[in-house]
Amino acid sequence: METIAKHRYARTSAQKARLVADLVRGKKVAQALEILTFTNKKAAALVKKVLESAIANAEHNDGADIDDLKVAKIFVDEGPSMKRVMPRAKGRADRILKRTSHITVVVSDR
């Protein structure tokens, strides 16, 4: 049984979150949580929270056994970018893009 959890509009770029997602793809959930706990990146905390949510969804909604679960799919899509202005010298301004991403984790017992 596949169970999904999503974090939409996560405040990190998709490029940075994908680095972390690649670490846990295909792993058992216990091993994935351990890897994410000791990964020193902001995106690791975001991905870990989504993974924990997916595990809780599988246990509560589908009655799955946690020991059998593995990360079947994990992917990070780009979300909308927030446009901000940074003032520069001589009355100029630069545009800053604050990027967001959508993190999706699918856990499965197969």
From Swiss-Prot:
InterPro entries: Ribosomal_uL22 (IPR001063), Ribosomal_uL22_bac/chlpt-type (IPR005727), Ribosomal_uL22_bac/org-type (IPR047867), Ribosomal_uL22_CS (IPR018260), Ribosomal_uL22_sf (IPR036394). GO terms for cellular component: cytosolic large ribosomal subunit. Disulfide bonds: none annotated. It holds the Pfam family Ribosomal_L22. Belongs to the universal ribosomal protein uL22 family. This protein binds specifically to 23S rRNA; its binding is stimulated by other ribosomal proteins, e.g. L4, L17, and L20. It is important during the early stages of 50S assembly. It makes multiple contacts with different domains of the 23S rRNA in the assembled 50S subunit and ribosome. HAMAP family: Ribosomal_uL22_B (MF_01331_B). This is Large ribosomal subunit protein uL22. It comes from Histophilus somni (strain 129Pt) (Haemophilus somnus). The lineage of its organism: Bacteria, Pseudomonadati, Pseudomonadota, Gammaproteobacteria, Pasteurellales. The gene is rplV.
